Protein backbone atom coordinates (compact mmCIF):
# COMPACT_ATOMS: atom_id res chain seq x y z
CA UNK A 1 0.00 0.00 0.00
CA UNK A 2 2.90 2.39 0.73
CA UNK A 3 4.14 1.80 -2.78
CA UNK A 4 0.80 2.57 -4.41
CA UNK A 5 0.40 5.73 -2.33
CA UNK A 6 3.88 6.87 -3.29
CA UNK A 7 3.21 6.32 -7.00
CA UNK A 8 -0.14 8.12 -6.89
CA UNK A 9 1.34 11.05 -4.98
CA UNK A 10 4.28 11.26 -7.35
CA UNK A 11 2.15 11.33 -10.50
CA UNK A 12 -0.30 13.84 -9.00
CA UNK A 13 2.46 16.21 -7.93
CA UNK A 14 4.68 15.73 -10.98
CA UNK A 15 2.50 14.97 -14.03
CA UNK A 16 5.42 15.86 -16.31
CA UNK A 17 6.96 12.50 -15.36
CA UNK A 18 3.96 10.32 -16.27
CA UNK A 19 5.99 8.97 -19.18
CA UNK A 20 8.10 6.76 -16.94
CA UNK A 21 6.90 3.88 -14.84
CA UNK A 22 7.52 2.34 -11.48
CA UNK A 23 8.12 -1.41 -11.65
CA UNK A 24 7.11 -3.88 -9.00
CA UNK A 25 9.92 -6.43 -8.91
CA UNK A 26 8.34 -8.79 -6.40
CA UNK A 27 7.77 -12.35 -7.52
CA UNK A 28 10.43 -12.37 -10.24
CA UNK A 29 13.01 -15.11 -10.51
CA UNK A 30 16.53 -14.17 -9.44
CA UNK A 31 17.64 -13.78 -13.06
CA UNK A 32 14.55 -11.75 -14.08
CA UNK A 33 15.01 -9.56 -11.01
CA UNK A 34 18.67 -8.87 -11.80
CA UNK A 35 17.85 -8.02 -15.42
CA UNK A 36 14.90 -5.81 -14.47
CA UNK A 37 16.77 -3.88 -11.81
CA UNK A 38 19.75 -3.24 -14.09
CA UNK A 39 17.43 -1.50 -16.56
CA UNK A 40 16.33 1.09 -13.98
CA UNK A 41 17.80 4.57 -13.60
CA UNK A 42 16.99 4.63 -9.88
CA UNK A 43 15.64 2.22 -7.27
CA UNK A 44 13.16 3.32 -4.62
CA UNK A 45 13.24 1.50 -1.29
CA UNK A 46 10.43 2.12 1.20
CA UNK A 47 10.74 -0.85 3.54
CA UNK A 48 11.07 0.44 7.10
CA UNK A 49 11.03 -3.08 8.56
CA UNK A 50 13.95 -4.61 6.70
CA UNK A 51 17.02 -4.55 8.89
CA UNK A 52 19.64 -5.50 6.31
CA UNK A 53 18.35 -4.17 3.01
CA UNK A 54 19.27 -6.59 0.25
CA UNK A 55 17.26 -4.65 -2.35
CA UNK A 56 19.37 -1.48 -2.12
CA UNK A 57 22.55 -3.55 -2.16
CA UNK A 58 21.40 -5.46 -5.23
CA UNK A 59 20.63 -2.14 -6.89
CA UNK A 60 24.05 -0.76 -6.01
CA UNK A 61 25.73 -3.94 -7.26
CA UNK A 62 24.36 -3.34 -10.78
CA UNK A 63 25.13 0.39 -10.64
CA UNK A 64 21.61 1.65 -9.96
CA UNK A 65 21.41 4.42 -7.33
CA UNK A 66 18.91 4.12 -4.49
CA UNK A 67 16.51 6.61 -2.97
CA UNK A 68 15.16 5.14 0.21
CA UNK A 69 13.45 5.56 3.50
CA UNK A 70 15.88 5.02 6.36
CA UNK A 71 14.67 1.83 8.08
CA UNK A 72 14.00 1.56 11.80
CA UNK A 73 17.23 -0.42 12.22
CA UNK A 74 19.84 1.26 10.05
CA UNK A 75 22.16 -1.28 8.36
CA UNK A 76 25.87 -0.72 8.98
CA UNK A 77 26.58 -0.39 5.24
CA UNK A 78 24.16 2.55 4.81
CA UNK A 79 25.73 6.01 4.72
CA UNK A 80 25.04 9.42 3.21
CA UNK A 81 27.48 8.83 0.35
CA UNK A 82 26.10 5.63 -1.17
CA UNK A 83 22.47 6.59 -1.70
CA UNK A 84 19.82 9.14 -0.88
CA UNK A 85 18.37 8.15 2.48
CA UNK A 86 15.56 10.08 4.12
CA UNK A 87 13.49 9.74 7.26
CA UNK A 88 10.48 11.78 6.17
CA UNK A 89 8.36 9.73 3.77
CA UNK A 90 6.42 12.84 2.74
CA UNK A 91 9.52 14.17 0.96
CA UNK A 92 10.02 11.01 -1.09
CA UNK A 93 8.08 12.06 -4.20
CA UNK A 94 9.90 15.43 -4.26
CA UNK A 95 13.26 13.74 -3.99
CA UNK A 96 12.41 11.27 -6.77
CA UNK A 97 11.35 14.20 -8.98
CA UNK A 98 14.57 16.10 -8.22
CA UNK A 99 16.63 12.98 -8.92
CA UNK A 100 14.80 12.42 -12.20
CA UNK A 101 15.44 15.97 -13.34
CA UNK A 102 19.12 15.71 -12.43
CA UNK A 103 19.37 12.34 -14.18
CA UNK A 104 17.76 13.74 -17.33
CA UNK A 105 20.26 16.61 -17.28
CA UNK A 106 23.14 14.15 -16.75
CA UNK A 107 23.85 15.86 -13.45
CA UNK A 108 24.44 12.89 -11.14
CA UNK A 109 27.73 12.81 -9.27
CA UNK A 110 30.12 10.05 -10.32
CA UNK A 111 31.21 9.99 -6.69
CA UNK A 112 27.91 8.36 -5.71
CA UNK A 113 28.49 5.54 -8.20
CA UNK A 114 32.01 5.07 -6.84
CA UNK A 115 30.72 4.98 -3.25
CA UNK A 116 28.02 2.48 -4.20
CA UNK A 117 30.63 0.18 -5.73
CA UNK A 118 32.89 0.50 -2.68
CA UNK A 119 29.95 -0.34 -0.41
CA UNK A 120 29.05 -3.59 -2.17
CA UNK A 121 32.68 -4.58 -2.74
CA UNK A 122 33.28 -4.53 1.03
CA UNK A 123 30.45 -6.98 1.71
CA UNK A 124 30.80 -10.75 1.45
CA UNK A 125 29.43 -12.55 -1.58
CA UNK A 126 26.46 -14.87 -1.18
CA UNK A 127 28.80 -17.88 -1.23
CA UNK A 128 31.13 -16.34 1.37
CA UNK A 129 28.14 -15.53 3.58
CA UNK A 130 26.76 -19.08 3.26
CA UNK A 131 30.15 -20.64 3.98
CA UNK A 132 30.69 -18.43 7.03
CA UNK A 133 27.19 -19.24 8.31
CA UNK A 134 27.80 -22.98 7.91
CA UNK A 135 31.19 -22.63 9.61
CA UNK A 136 29.67 -20.76 12.57
CA UNK A 137 26.81 -23.23 13.01
CA UNK A 138 29.17 -26.20 12.71
CA UNK A 139 31.44 -24.69 15.36
CA UNK A 140 28.44 -24.01 17.60
CA UNK A 141 27.09 -27.55 17.22
CA UNK A 142 30.51 -29.04 17.94
CA UNK A 143 30.80 -26.95 21.11
CA UNK A 144 27.31 -28.00 22.20
CA UNK A 145 28.11 -31.66 21.55
CA UNK A 146 31.36 -31.37 23.52
CA UNK A 147 29.52 -29.70 26.40
CA UNK A 148 26.86 -32.42 26.40
CA UNK A 149 29.54 -35.14 26.41
CA UNK A 150 31.26 -33.46 29.37
CA UNK A 151 27.98 -33.28 31.28
CA UNK A 152 27.19 -36.92 30.53
CA UNK A 153 30.70 -37.90 31.63
CA UNK A 154 30.27 -36.01 34.93
CA UNK A 155 26.87 -37.60 35.44
CA UNK A 156 28.25 -41.11 34.85
CA UNK A 157 31.14 -40.58 37.29
Residue ranges of predicted features:
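Conserved catalytic-core segment of nucleotide-activated headgroup transferases in glycan assembly
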Residues: 1-30
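Short alpha-helical segment that forms part of, or immediately flanks, the ligand-binding pocket
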Residues: 34, 57-61, 75-76
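Acidic donor-binding loop of glycosyltransferase active sites
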Residues: 35-51
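Short, well-ordered alpha-helix to beta-strand connector turns
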Residues: 40, 63, 80-81
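Nucleotide-sugar-dependent
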Residues: 47-55, 71, 75-76
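A charged, aromatic-enriched C-terminal amphipathic alpha-helix characteristic of glycosyltransferases
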Residues: 104-156
Amino acid sequence: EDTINLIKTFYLRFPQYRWFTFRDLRGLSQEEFANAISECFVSVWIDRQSAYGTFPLESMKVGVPVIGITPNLVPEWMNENNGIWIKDEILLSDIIADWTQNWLEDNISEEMYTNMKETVDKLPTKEQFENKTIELFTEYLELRAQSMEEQISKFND
